[in-house]
């Protein structure tokens, strides 16, 4: 049986750990509130640009743009959103497991058939160690990234599609459902063959022309899909970390309760032993 000193040291150590996890939980909760606001505030822009693109794509005939046209798929691009830091439960492992499975099933790990653009240090390290074909990466993103932080990467990804580096582009990330639920999600970014708006389409008059508008608007729309997924993923990351730290704190409190019970029992046993020895010694002197 562990000594009273050992049990007491374990209790103190666990208390200190619980203080750390509680602080991390509170920090993550604060970051989550802001991340939720960022994601929600981006929705109106996404909906409006989607409405305009859908109005052109569905309301006009003869519109021909490479980003709207499907072509034979010889190579597929993947954007994978992960985090730079751990302690977030299954946030990273879930999306990386899904991406790994998809690439093995679709491409049999043939680097000539796929390429990966990865966001986040943990995702980069995981995929590199396992020999996946990474062609671009971004690490060190802010907890609350701006569009500027991701624009260069998104522009490169779109340019590679236009140049034929791959024939379709998907993005994988954790979609934020609630504080306790996040879902691994696959969205097709390019080509934009299924652009639809949930709202009733408003008729627009375009100047100088629909084709010229699309040249500017389609890359912006594709970039906004990437940025929207990043904001969604950041909210999921903070929610997952908050939940993980709450679970760790709760587990620590259970351990403390168990250790305290063991400490009290050991202390009671020690006192009983001392009393027995004193009584026995007194009886021997009589």
Swiss-Prot record:
A Pfam family hit: ATP-synt
Localization annotation: Cell membrane
Residues that span the membrane, as ranges: none
InterPro entries: ATP_synth_F1_ATPase_gsu, ATP_synth_F1_gsu, ATP_synth_F1_gsu_CS
Main location: membrane
GO terms for cellular component: plasma membrane; proton-transporting ATP synthase complex
Topological category with respect to the lipid bilayer: Peripheral membrane protein
GO MF entry, a single one: ATP binding
This protein's UniProt keywords: ATP synthesis, Cell membrane, CF(1), Hydrogen ion transport, Ion transport, Membrane, Transport
A single BP term in Gene Ontology: proton motive force-driven plasma membrane ATP synthesis
Function recorded in the entry: Produces ATP from ADP in the presence of a proton gradient across the membrane. The gamma chain is believed to be important in regulating ATPase activity and the flow of protons through the CF(0) complex.
PANTHER family registered for this protein in UniProt: ATP SYNTHASE GAMMA CHAIN (PTHR11693), ATP SYNTHASE SUBUNIT GAMMA, MITOCHONDRIAL (PTHR11693:SF22)
Subunit description: F-type ATPases have 2 components, CF(1) - the catalytic core - and CF(0) - the membrane proton channel. CF(1) has five subunits: alpha(3), beta(3), gamma(1), delta(1), epsilon(1). CF(0) has three main subunits: a, b and c.
Family designation: Belongs to the ATPase gamma chain family.
HAMAP family: ATP_synth_gamma_bact
NCBIfam families on file: ATPsyn_F1gamma
Protein name, entry field: ATP synthase gamma chain
């Amino acid at each position: 049986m562990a000594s009273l000193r050992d049990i007491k040291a374990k209790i103190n150590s666990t208390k200190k750990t619980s203080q750390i996890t509680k602080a991390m939980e509170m920090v993550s909760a604060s970051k989550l509130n802001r991340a939720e606001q960022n994601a929600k505030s981006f929705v109106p822009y996404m909906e409006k640009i989607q409405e305009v693109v859908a109005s052109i794509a569905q309301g006009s005939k003869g519109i021909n743009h490479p980003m709207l046209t499907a072509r034979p798929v010889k190579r597929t691009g993947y954007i994978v959103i992960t985090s730079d830091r751990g302690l977030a439960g299954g946030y990273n492992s879930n999306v990386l497991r899904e991406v790994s499975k998809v690439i093995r099933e679709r491409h049999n790990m043939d680097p000539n058939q796929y390429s990966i653009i990865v966001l986040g240090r943990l995702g980069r390290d995981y995929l590199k160690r396992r020999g996946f074909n990474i062609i671009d990466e971004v690490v060190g993103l802010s907890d609350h990234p701006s569009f500027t932080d991701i624009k260069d990467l998104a522009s490169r990804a779109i340019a590679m599609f236009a140049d034929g580096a791959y024939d379709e582009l998907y993005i994988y990330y954790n979609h934020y459902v609630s504080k306790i639920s996040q879902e691994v999600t696959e969205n097709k970014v390019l080509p934009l063959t299924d652009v639809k708006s949930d709202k009733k389409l408003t008729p627009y008059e375009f100047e100088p022309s629909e084709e010229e508008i699309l040249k500017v608007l389609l890359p912006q729309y594709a970039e906004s899909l990437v940025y929207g997924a990043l904001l969604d993923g950041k909210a999921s990351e903070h929610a997952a970390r908050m939940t993980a730290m709450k679970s760790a704190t709760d587990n620590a409190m259970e351990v403390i309760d168990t250790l305290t019970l063991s400490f009290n029992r050991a202390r009671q046993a020690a006192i009983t032993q001392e009393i027995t020895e004193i009584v026995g010694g007194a009886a021997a002197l009589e």
